[in-house]
């Protein structure tokens, strides 16, 4: 444990001591606005309550003045909890929520500064100029295609969640030593009304974020996951040292470092040979492969089930030591890749094993060679996608298309554009599927839901509406996949209807998962 502590301290040499004074700088609130607050209460509420957007600078100055007054700062968020119709005037309710949102978003910008600087220095050190290409979600799947076919076991991991938010403050304190700033963080976590929405259920391992303070809570959760992975890096580096030295096979590798230090390797091999009456070959520790998205992760290896079990309890023990809470072992499930399929990033992935027989003729003798090939397979979980469409009110739970009443007041072009965009995005995201027939069922649901929505708007039936305008009206907005591929690739490359079902294409411009895919 002392070695772990020393390893952690080496990587935390840059600690920020002066972040709290940044809250009193006006440009921080301008940065918060530029980072995408146009769709939040920062400005939308000003329009709703009748305030002009130009008064935001004056409100920021008024907020900074109130921050200097400690009592005003303490009651600032508490005022936003109250209902504006009970004992609060129209102005007080707006000011309290407006100030609360400005502090929360600006706090998020400030707390990200030390980690942004650390990322920039890392990219310069590693000479990675175009790191944004690595942000694509689809970049994970070519990696899995290349690696998983050679591995044996995979551990499905649910990232554990802390019991108390004070744990998050304590691990953040290792990076930031500005005491007033950390006190303000505690204030956010314990006093905000939106704290009630900052939960983790037993079925899910990710936070349900508040809409108003989504950026702050997302940062805290991502930082916590980063710390969980930080322990994995430490364990992985310790394990990688073994690959530098050849060693004999030990059925029980307890106190392995002590045995190597105090005993001769040759003597240990002799002991093993005498006990098990066989000669053991030297070997290296197998490589481990780790991939994570949101609150789920997979750890794959070419090793044995015993090795994966030891890794499992390494994770559990280190999490308990470092975060001071009980981590249930059932959150890490070990499975054999050949008999296991896992849901990851909107795909149902598995390892297919195909056998082929080859007849070999040598002079007068012939024999048959059986060859096994492994292939990483990804298919679209149609049932889960239909469930997502059902939650979004595009169809029933059984997949029967229904109209979207909330969109009936839009123009025809807007309705067609929204349905067409959803359909194209789903086809774009699931372009890596090995079987795309299920996507055409999703396309049928969206097309008929669009037709029902338009018919509802014009107070007509679907058949009458399509007969009057023609079914070709929907074809323009639901672009076929073959047409999209023909625009992306040279004309010499032919994509037939049959081939498009098998062709897998991964895009490196997808930096976030589709909302409908994420719901499934």
From Swiss-Prot:
Principal location class: plastid
Organism: Galanthus elwesii (Giant snowdrop)
Family matches, as Pfam families: Intron_maturas2 (PF01348), MatK_N (PF01824)
PANTHER family for this protein: MATURASE K
Protein name as catalogued: Maturase K
Role noted for this protein: Usually encoded in the trnK tRNA gene intron. Probably assists in splicing its own and other chloroplast group II introns.
Alphabetic keyword roster: Chloroplast, mRNA processing, Plastid, RNA-binding, tRNA processing
Family: Belongs to the intron maturase 2 family. MatK subfamily.
Gene Ontology molecular function terms on file: RNA binding
InterPro entries registered for this protein in UniProt: Domain_X, Maturase_MatK, Maturase_MatK_N
Upper lineage: Eukaryota, Viridiplantae, Streptophyta, Embryophyta, Tracheophyta
């Amino acid at each position: 444990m002392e070695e772990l502590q020393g390893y952690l301290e080496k990587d935390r040499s840059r600690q920020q001591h002066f972040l709290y004074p940044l809250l009193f700088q006006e440009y921080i609130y301008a940065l918060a606005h530029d980072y995408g607050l146009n769709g939040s209460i920062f400005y939308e509420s000003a329009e709703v309550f009748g305030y002009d957007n130009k008064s935001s600078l004056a409100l920021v100055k008024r907020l900074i003045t109130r921050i200097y007054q400690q009592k005003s700062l303490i009651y600032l968020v508490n005022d936003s909890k109250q209902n504006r119709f009970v004992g609060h005037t129209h102005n007080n309710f707006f000011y309290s929520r407006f100030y609360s949102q400005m502090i929360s978003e600006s706090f998020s910008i400030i707390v990200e500064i030390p980690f942004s600087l650390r990322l920039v220095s890392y990219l310069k050190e590693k000479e990675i100029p175009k790191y944004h290409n690595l942000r694509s979600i689809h970049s994970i799947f070519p990696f899995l295609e290349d690696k998983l076919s050679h591995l044996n076991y995979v551990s499905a991991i649910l990232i554990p969640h802390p019991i108390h938010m004070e744990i998050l403050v304590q691990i953040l304190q290792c990076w930031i030593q500005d005491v007033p700033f950390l006190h303000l963080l505690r204030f956010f976590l314990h006093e905000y009304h939106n704290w009630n929405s900052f939960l983790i259920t037993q079925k899910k391992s990710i936070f349900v974020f508040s809409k108003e303070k989504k950026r702050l809570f997302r940062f805290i959760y991502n930082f916590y996951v980063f710390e969980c992975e930080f322990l994995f890096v430490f364990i992985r580096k310790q394990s990688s040292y073994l690959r530098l030295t050849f060693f004999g096979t030990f059925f029980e590798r307890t106190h392995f470092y002590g045995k190597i230090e105090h005993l001769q390797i040759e003597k240990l091999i002799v002991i093993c040979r005498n006990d098990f009456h066989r000669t053991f070959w030297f070997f290296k520790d197998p490589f481990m492969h780790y991939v994570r998205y949101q609150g789920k992760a997979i750890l794959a290896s070419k090793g044995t089930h015993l090795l994966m079990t030891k890794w499992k309890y390494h994770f559990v023990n280190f999490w308990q030591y470092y975060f001071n809470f009980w981590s249930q072992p059932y959150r890490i499930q070990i499975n054999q890749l050949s008999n296991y399929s896992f849901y990851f990033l909107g795909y149902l992935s598995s390892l297919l094993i195909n056998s082929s027989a080859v007849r070999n003729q040598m002079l007068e003798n012939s024999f048959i060679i059986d060859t096994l090939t492994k292939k990483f397979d990804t298919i679209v979980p149609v049932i889960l996608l239909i469930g997502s469409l059902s939650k979004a009110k595009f169809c029933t739970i059984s997949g029967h298309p229904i109209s979207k009443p909330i969109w009936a007041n839009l123009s025809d072009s807007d309705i067609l554009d929204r349905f067409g965009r959803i359909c194209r995005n789903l086809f774009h995201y699931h372009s890596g599927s090995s079987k795309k027939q299920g996507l055409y069922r999703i396309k049928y649901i969206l097309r008929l839901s669009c037709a029902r929505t338009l018919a509802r708007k014009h107070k007509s039936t679907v058949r009458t509406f399509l007969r009057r305008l023609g079914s070709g009206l929907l074809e323009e907005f639901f672009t076929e996949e073959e047409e999209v591929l023909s625009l992306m690739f040279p004309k010499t490359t032919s994509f037939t209807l049959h081939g498009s079902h098998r062709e897998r294409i991964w895009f490196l411009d997808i930096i976030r998962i589709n909302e409908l895919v994420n719901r499934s």
